[in-house]
Amino acid sequence: MAVAAPLFGKLALQGPRAEMEDDMELEEGRIPEFTFAAVYDGHAGISSVNYLKKELFSECVNALQGGALLQSDNSIDLEAALSQAFVQVDKRLLSWLEQQEESDRESGSTATVMFLGKEKVVVAHVGDSRVVISRGGKAEELTSDHRPYGSSKTALAEGKRVIAAGGWISNGRVCGNLAVSRAFGDISLKSRRKEMLEEGLKKNLWTQKFVSKRDLTGEWLTAAPDVTAATLGQDAEFIILASDGLWDSIKSKDAVAFVREQLKEHGDIQRACESLAAAALAQNGQDNISILIADFGKVARVDGLAQHQDVSAGVKQVLVTSGILLLGVYASHLASLIR
């Protein structure tokens, strides 16, 4: 059953970081029956993020045959098309990075994109930005973080994949360098691995024996995405798409509960988005934060919610502090616009 056309709230904050390396994209009306949304979380500069904003949407649409494959129930074709789009854009990005100044050449980025229709949502992602649906107040994660550390099923599988391809995991990072196991760009872990190993040898970071055991034919770091399609249904209340700056501070279930309380209180999805960002900062958030929320209008406003007590302890804590920090959120947002 179809859901109502969503209202969107979105906010990007630099937070305490010296640079803003996050960005997001929202394209409405450019694909029949679907809206495109994306969050890009860059590292070692913003150049890869800027490239993805220019190239990834159009490449995905072309691979999806103008959006026709989004209407199909053939998950194999859908996954193949989006995987092709991601990999092709990454190949072009690597060639482009080779031509850039040294300060921009080493950049990379995660990418989490979703195609939101009336009856289903399709998500493709590399990295650790996350998509979460609220279904009747229950959090359903549509993505699994591509990180090479931790005990989750995905983390263990990603670590094994990197090692099987000839790379290694050190201090929870791919080759001791990158905290995500899938990403766009990062030429030192792709097309310039030989040069990276030679440089490390000069700096005594590893031995010649260690270098000789590295397999340079496999993909240590890949831009091939995981692709998920989910039916929305009448229990779908809203969808949160956000960078790890949110999820490292607030659990998925608490983010869903927080947004529901906000919508019950005032019904404004933009205010809810801003308050959620403030809540992440209140939880000692140390990263850039980008949040986009699609609200299907299912959470009814409740008068007199200030006296509402049926909230978890974690959500109560962020509710108390987020209001105080909203002025800081606005100030940070304005500062990022000026920059």
Report each predicted region and the residues it spans.
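PP2C/PPM-type serine/threonine phosphatase catalytic domain
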Residues: 1-339
